């Protein structure tokens, strides 16, 4: 958690470390604060520090430093629906790797997933504690609240069903005591009634889970401007996934790393030009 104290063109930024010890950093009149705590942490810290909806902050007895009604709004995540198949023979998994960061893991379950990229549904972030930054905030993504997202999920789940009915997938089936062959699922199986939209919609809602692609809360054009400055506060920028209006179609890790590099170089150039 941090808070600012302004005096004669200078800022004292008060923050606490992982051990709960408080520190002060002096920021000059040309200095800046860069907040990069992620799609969950950045809006949470802004709210705790008094940057947010005036009515909401006042209801929590948090002093309003800067009125900004869109902090914590437009929270979104790429929803995922998947099936887990129990595999009855050894096989070589091919887990995804992102910019050589993730490590491979041996599995005995095959997971097949579909996701809705660029969801139109969004929710909000609220504080669970008005004083404690370590308290996990309350986040609602409201998956499939927009009918377009739900319609895309129905199409995606049906594609999974089409794939499961191919000859290539037959080798993953088990033979039951009655001689019939079928898949063994860990968790929910695909709905059997493909012709009924409501049945597949219920499946989408009941089996949705996250791809951990959280974004929103400090959107460009809503909370920060095109240079990622919090609008109305020239000395504060937010540079992370909380500013994204929409995510790339895959894991945003590499995009976020390049955003940090881009903004670092841009700010360095701006400082040199101002000298």
Regions from the PLM with identified roles:
Residues 232-248:
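Short FAD-binding loop at a beta-strand-to-alpha-helix junction that anchors the flavin cofactor
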Residues 43-118, 129, 146-198, 202-214, ...:
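Mid-to-C-terminal "cap/lid" subdomains and adjacent gly/pro-rich loops that border
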Residues 17, 37-38, 49:
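Glycine-rich, N-terminal phosphate-binding loop of Rossmann-like dinucleotide-binding domains
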Residues 19-32, 36:
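Core beta-strand elements of the Rossmann-like FAD/NAD(P) dinucleotide-binding domain
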Residues 19-21, 144-151, 249-254:
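Conserved, non-catalytic sequence blocks in retroelement Pol enzymes and Pol-derived host proteins
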Residues 1-19, 73:
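A conserved short coil-to-beta-strand element within the FAD-binding core of flavoproteins
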Residues 246-265:
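A conserved FAD-binding loop/helix module that cradles the flavin
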Residues 114-126, 215-237:
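FAD-binding beta-loop-beta segment adjacent to the flavin cofactor pocket
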């Amino acid at each position: 958690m941090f808070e600012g104290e302004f005096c004669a063109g200078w800022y004292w930024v008060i923050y606490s470390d992982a051990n709960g010890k408080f520190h002060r950093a002096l920021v000059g009149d040309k200095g800046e604060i860069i907040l990069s705590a992620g799609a969950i942490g950045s809006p949470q810290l802004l709210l705790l520090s008094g940057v947010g909806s005036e009515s909401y902050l006042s209801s929590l007895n948090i002093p309003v430093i800067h009125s900004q009604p869109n902090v914590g709004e437009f929270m979104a995540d790429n929803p995922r629906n998947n099936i887990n198949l129990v595999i009855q023979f050894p096989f070589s998994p091919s887990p995804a790797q992102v910019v050589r960061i993730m490590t491979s893991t041996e599995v005995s379950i095959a997971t097949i997933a579909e996701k809705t990229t660029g969801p139109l549904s969004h929710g909000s972030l609220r504080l669970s504690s008005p004083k404690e930054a370590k308290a996990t905030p309350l986040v609602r993504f409201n998956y499939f609240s927009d009918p377009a997202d739900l319609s895309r999920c129905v199409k995606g789940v049906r594609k999974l069903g089409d794939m499961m009915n191919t000859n290539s997938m037959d080798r993953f089936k088990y033979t039951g005591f009655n001689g019939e062959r079928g898949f063994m699922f860990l968790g929910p199986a695909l709905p059997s009634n493909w012709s009924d939209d409501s049945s597949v919609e219920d499946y989408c809602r009941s089996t949705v889970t996250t791809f951990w692609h959280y974004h929103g809360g400090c959107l460009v054009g809503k909370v920060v401007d095109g240079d990622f400055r919090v609008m109305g506060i020239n000395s504060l920028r937010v540079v992370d996934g909380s500013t994204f209006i929409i995510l790339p179609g895959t894991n945003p890790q590499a995009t976020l790393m390049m955003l940090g590099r881009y903004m670092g170089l841009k700010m360095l150039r701006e400082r040199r030009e101002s000298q």
